[in-house]
Amino acid sequence: MQTAYFSGGCFWCVEAIFQRIVGIIKLTSGYCNGNTSNPTYQDICLGVTGHAEVVKIEFDEFKISFKVLLDIFFEIHNPTTLNQQGNDRGTQYRSAIFYINNKQQLQAINMINLMSDNIVTQVTKLDCFYPAEDYHQNYFNNNLSKPYCQMLIRPKLDKYFSQ
């Protein structure tokens, strides 16, 4: 089993798509690489802790590669907007790949180098990860009728999986 950490805006959207990908074993929404220990969602929303909203992806490398995960990651968010995805604004929503080894770092950098010059995605060593509160886990599946899920997450799922 391997692990990847991606920040591409609100973790609810990122989680919802990766939940539907073959080879994914477990997903955990959380916060990483900030300047405080054990942050809460309220802390993150203030935008002063330095943490990013991330999804920790545990995957079977025999069924899906890190490179394929990178391909999906870059398809499901806008890597050219600094600290913003749609209406979500702030450093917690930055586009970032938090690598755990040199191979992941090199694959991420190589992929970005093949893309346009406008990519703002950070490639940063993972320093720390804190799981988000329980109500953030499996958010879309647990809250299908909520307006955010219907207006933002559902269309992203439909768009990605209709390709």
Swiss-Prot record:
**Organism placement in taxonomy:** Bacteria, Pseudomonadati, Pseudomonadota, Gammaproteobacteria, Candidatus Pseudothioglobaceae
Gene3D superfamilies this protein is in?
A: Peptide methionine sulphoxide reductase MsrA
Q: Which domain of life is it from?
A: Bacteria
The protein's annotated catalytic reaction(s) are: L-methionyl-[protein] + [thioredoxin]-disulfide + H2O = L-methionyl-(S)-S-oxide-[protein] + [thioredoxin]-dithiol; [thioredoxin]-disulfide + L-methionine + H2O = L-methionine (S)-S-oxide + [thioredoxin]-dithiol
Membership in a protein family: Belongs to the MsrA Met sulfoxide reductase family.
**Which residues are the active-site ones?**
C10
What InterPro entries does this protein map onto?
Met_Sox_Rdtase_MsrA_dom (IPR002569), Met_Sox_Rdtase_MsrA_sf (IPR036509)
User: What protein name applies here?
Assistant: Peptide methionine sulfoxide reductase MsrA
GO biological process terms on file: protein modification process
Q: EC?
A: 1.8.4.11
> Which organism is this entry from?
Vesicomyosocius okutanii subsp. Calyptogena okutanii (strain HA)
Q: Name one GO molecular function term.
A: L-methionine:thioredoxin-disulfide S-oxidoreductase activity
